[in-house]
Design a protein with these regions (language model features):
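Core alpha/beta nucleotide-donor-binding catalytic domains of modification enzymes
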Residues: 2-117, 123-138, 146
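Extracellular structured ligand-interaction cores
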Residues: 3, 168-170, 328-330
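Short, solvent-exposed loop/turn segments at secondary-structure junctions
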Residues: 14, 81-85, 124-125, 160-162, ...
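Short, flexible loop/turn segments with low-complexity composition
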Residues: 62, 187-190, 408-412
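Class I S-adenosyl-L-methionine
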Residues: 66-73, 87-320
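Proline-centered helix-kink/hinge sites
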Residues: 80-81, 115, 165, 370-371, ...
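C-terminal target-recognition/interaction regions appended to catalytic cores
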Residues: 241-412
Length: 412
């Protein structure tokens, strides 16, 4: 079998590459790009090179510059920046935001190189972005793929549903070019059977279903034609235009189908299974001085606050588990993990029975990385990079599927 030439964008600490290489020796990374514009020290890129070597095809540049040197490839992968789509960021501007606009660099690569397959990852909110015009950004992304000659299948996957130790919901998009066997099969099914054919692809015969099976669908669904959306130009969708996309869907020949799916849930992997069971440094344990702060952050609130202009308002939020249950998968890790914050996990240490935060190694395990994958960078950045990372075993499963599809095509 010929090697599958891979270009990895927004590579981070290498989660996509690690998963693909665990899946098959048939993947060959011909370019990897990682650059964090807000930081002088490039900790994620340095981590990437510690594991995959100092090579000329590893590029630490702005994607605007780096895309000019992209070689021919068959698979484009990347977890493109999510801050402008994330519910964790107030006022996220979606595809118009500072990092959201990087989508247009991906689109330029699609137009120029037209790789056979594309696998992208983003936050689950991508399909509903922006908040004031739900579905606008995702419809633009689908339109870009359509105009570049691709079909797209997407799925919002909760890693915990498929046996991982973290409840991390992420949108995965798999695009396949219009000269592939998968495209021909999808086109034929939809042409002959319409909505029934789309359901069969999403439930059984498409890209995701064989590796992340579904029980079925809820009654929520939407369908339509991308040509019906009113674009002043591709970046400027009518301000009145919105579309409801659900967590599973398919776009073929400009027509989209989207449904709310019910996953087959694998046996759960509890948070307790990733904890280090030995004596840890005192810095991870909650001190008597800050326990009250933790209790406040994790507790329910209904309190009077004031906006910057002095306007009063009542702020309310419910209580969170404190400490986190060791018998359930963890909550989603954020980049602020390990700090004194509402979102950070607090667990009962199995060695001492005292309350503590998660260690960097435990965060790596929650994302399926080997222990100490991020060792060598400041500890704050170890948490930060894991808060940005994807769950490697999910990519491994998708890598096996892509390798099998490619092998079938090369045989035929």
């Amino acid at each position: 079998m010929e090697k599958i030439r891979v270009v990895e964008l927004f590579a981070g600490v290498g989660g996509f590459r690690l998963g693909l290489e665990q899946a098959s020796a048939n993947f060959q990374t011909v370019l990897a790009n990682q650059w964090e514009p807000s930081m002088q020290a490039q900790f994620a890129f340095d981590c990437y090179e510690r594991h995959f070597g100092h090579r000329p095809e590893h590029v630490c540049q702005n994607i605007v510059t780096a895309k000019e040197g992209i070689p021919p490839h068959g698979l484009l992968v990347g977890g493109f920046p999510c801050q402008d789509y994330s519910i964790a960021k107030k006022g996220a501007r979606g595809i118009e935001g500072k990092k959201g606009i990087l989508w247009w660099e991906i689109n330029a690569i699609l137009q120029t190189h037209r790789p056979r397959y594309v696998l992208l990852e983003n936050v689950d909110r991508l399909i509903k972005s922006p908040a004031w015009q739900k579905g606008r950004d995702f419809s633009i992304i689908l339109r870009c793929f359509y105009e570049a000659g691709y079909a797209v299948e997407w799925r919002v996957i909760n890693a915990a549903d498929y046996g991982e130790a973290q409840r991390r919901r992420r949108t995965f998009l798999f695009a396949f070019r219009n000269d592939t066997a998968l495209f021909r099969e999808a086109s034929e099914k939809i042409c002959i059977s319409g909505l029934k054919g789309a359901h069969q692809l999403l439930l059984q015969d498409g890209f995701f279903a064989p590796i992340f099976p579904l029980y079925g669908f809820e009654r929520k669904y939407s369908e339509g034609w991308l040509d019906e959306f009113r674009y002043l130009d591709l970046k400027d969708l009518s301000a009145r235009q919105s579309c409801h996309f659900y967590d599973s869907g398919l776009m073929v020949n400009g027509r989209f189908y989207s449904v709310e799916s019910i996953p087959v849930q694998f046996p759960p992997c509890p948070l307790g299974s990733v904890l280090e069971n030995h004596e840890l440094d005192e810095r991870y344990f909650l001190s008597a001085a800050n326990i009250e702060r933790w209790q406040y952050l994790k507790g329910s609130k209904h309190e009077l606050r004031h906006r910057k202009n002095g306007t009063p308002y009542f702020f309310s939020e419910g209580a969170m588990a404190f400490p986190d249950s060791l018998d359930l998968p963890s909550r989603t890790m954020l980049t602020s993990e390990g700090t004194v914050s509402r979102s950070s996990h607090v667990v009962v240490d199995p060695w001492t029975q005292r309350l503590r935060t998660l260690t960097p190694i435990e965060c790596e395990r929650l994302n399926g990385f080997p222990d100490n994958w991020t060792a060598g960078m400041p500890e704050r950045m170890r948490y930060f990079t894991m808060g940005n990372a994807l769950v490697v075993p999910l990519v491994k499963a998708m890598g096996k599927r892509i390798s099998a599809l490619t092998e079938d095509e090369q045989r035929s």
